[in-house]
């Protein structure tokens, strides 16, 4: 389930994920603080549109909550610890510190990061996330006009910058990279847009590509899911 914004814990789940197995979510960002205001976001509209990295949840609180949860004797412990939630995880200035601590204290768990890719052009961000086992970045378009329609970014973010950051990450990162593409009918599913996305994916050479469509209500009512027939055609 998406985050609602009224949670007091930075942990959520675990949930059984098709992609990851049993996953415990770690949310390091104040609810709906993001670099984008995507029309399809199941957490709702972004209330704090920003590219400024800061500490939202103290490292000590995160590690304490994890210690309590992971040593609580859960009969179905998680397989993966996943950085995600109600905002963009790479906005957390202590992300790298937390990743390093988890790798040291809980090496038995895989780490996963879900990111909208907007801060991957920052070499510091890329260095911080390199120890993560699985990174799932998103790229929904490489067209500036469509990018504004779908993702509604903070100032200074462009699809060219995102793709450049993704390519830098691909060169530097040795873990599993799974590209996520969210399809919005009649916006980024035209033959021209899909051709551009295929070209970008061919350049990136991810370990896998995941096509997603609306599953729950997005932030804008006009966004509709892709039909199973059309999704199959896109694949």
Language-model features: locations:
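Auxiliary Fe-S-binding modules of radical SAM enzymes
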Residues: 1-22, 33, 64, 71-74, ...
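Canonical Radical SAM [4Fe-4S] cluster-binding loop centered on the CxxxCxxC motif
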Residues: 18-60
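Structural motif
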Residues: 21-23, 38, 78, 134, ...
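Short strand->helix junction
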Residues: 31, 48, 88-89, 186-187
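Short, basic/glycine-rich phosphate-binding loops at helix/coil junctions
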Residues: 41-46, 77-81, 142-146, 177-178
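Conserved alpha-helical substructure of the radical SAM core
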Residues: 45-82, 93-97
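Glycine-rich beta-strand-to-loop/alpha-helix junction loops that act as flexible
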Residues: 82-88, 116
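Conserved AdoMet/S-adenosylmethionine-binding subsite of the radical SAM
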Residues: 91-226
């Amino acid at each position: 389930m998406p985050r609602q914004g009224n949670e007091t814990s930075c942990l959520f789940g675990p949930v059984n994920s098709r992609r990851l197995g049993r996953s415990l979510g770690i949310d390091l960002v104040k609810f709906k603080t993001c670099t984008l205001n995507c029309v399809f976001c199941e957490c709702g509209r972004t209330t704090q549109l920003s590219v400024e990295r800061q500490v939202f949840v103290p490292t000590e609180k995160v590690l304490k909550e994890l210690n309590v949860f992971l040593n609580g004797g859960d009969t179905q412990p998680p397989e993966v610890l996943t950085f995600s939630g109600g905002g963009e995880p790479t906005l957390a200035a202590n992300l790298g510190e937390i990743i390093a601590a988890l790798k040291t204290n809980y090496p038995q768990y895989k780490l996963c990061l879900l990111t909208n890719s907007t801060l991957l052009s920052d070499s510091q961000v890329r260095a911080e996330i390199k120890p993560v086992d699985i990174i799932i970045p998103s790229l929904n378009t490489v067209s500036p006009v469509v990018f504004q329609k779908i993702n509604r970014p903070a100032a200074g973010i462009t699809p060219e910058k995102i793709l450049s950051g993704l390519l830098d990450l691909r060169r530097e990162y040795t873990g599993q990279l799974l590209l996520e593409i969210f399809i919005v009918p009649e916006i980024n599913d035209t033959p021209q847009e899909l051709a551009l996305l295929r070209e970008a994916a061919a350049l990136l050479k991810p370990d896998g590509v995941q096509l997603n469509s609306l599953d729950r209500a997005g932030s804008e009512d006009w966004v509709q899911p892709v039909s199973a027939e059309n999704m199959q055609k896109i694949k």
